[in-house]
Amino acid sequence: MNRYILFFIFLTGSVGGITAQQAKIDSSYANWYYQQRMAYFEKLPTIQRAVIFLGNSITERAEWQELLADYRYPVLNRGIGGDNSFGILARIDDVVRNKPRAVFLMDGINDQFRKLPHEVSIQNYRRIVRKIKMKSPRTKIYIQSALPINEMITTEDYTRGRNELVPELNKKLSQLAKEEDVVFIDLCPLFQDDEGRLSKEYTVDGVHLIPTAYIKWVKLLKDKKYL
């Protein structure tokens, strides 16, 4: 699906008044890969009270079931490579249909690659969180920070100038978590270097994590008693 929709984003000024900004937003998400993953999810067995990792390719590439093979509850991977906040919002009803025990949500970087205004991403996050609360009120919700990227390694033009957008997005995600009374997990200290970039130790392409990085990720979740 390739479609563009027009948003009127209202931003409250720090001094007074409300200013309206008009932005053309790329809200597309349902490409062939998204559709194939959704078809795959639909054919999987129904599992109640699972722990779900939800997000884009950074989530999808993790072997969560193996990383948490000794965990006492089922663990499901609901990552879709290339997904963004619009795509996750569109499929959240399916994600929580079977009343998961917990949802670990991570998104954001693909929104940044499109240069979506943070207000749009946060609005989508808020709607995702509220849909989970409405459809599955006993589900524990964890918002995980967007990870930095390393523009010294990335090769695609759409990654240029994007890493500087990540800290502000994460500040707004942290504030959203407080407002919605859910848990915010800051993963950035695990994987960033002194310059705030995704450390070369943990990436090959400047965007995605190497497999062993996920061991560190899961250790943090266990240490914090989120798992």
Please place each PLM-identified region on the residue numbering:
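Charged helix-capping and loop-helix junction motifs
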Residues: 118-128, 166-169
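Solvent-exposed loop/turn segments at secondary-structure junctions
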Residues: 57-61, 81-85, 109-114, 147-151, ...
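Catalytic His-Asp segment of secreted/periplasmic serine-dependent ester chemistry enzymes
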Residues: 22, 148-227
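Serine-esterase "nucleophile elbow" of acetyl-processing enzymes
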Residues: 20-102
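Surface-exposed cleft-lining segments at the edges of enzyme active sites
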Residues: 77-80, 109-121, 156-162
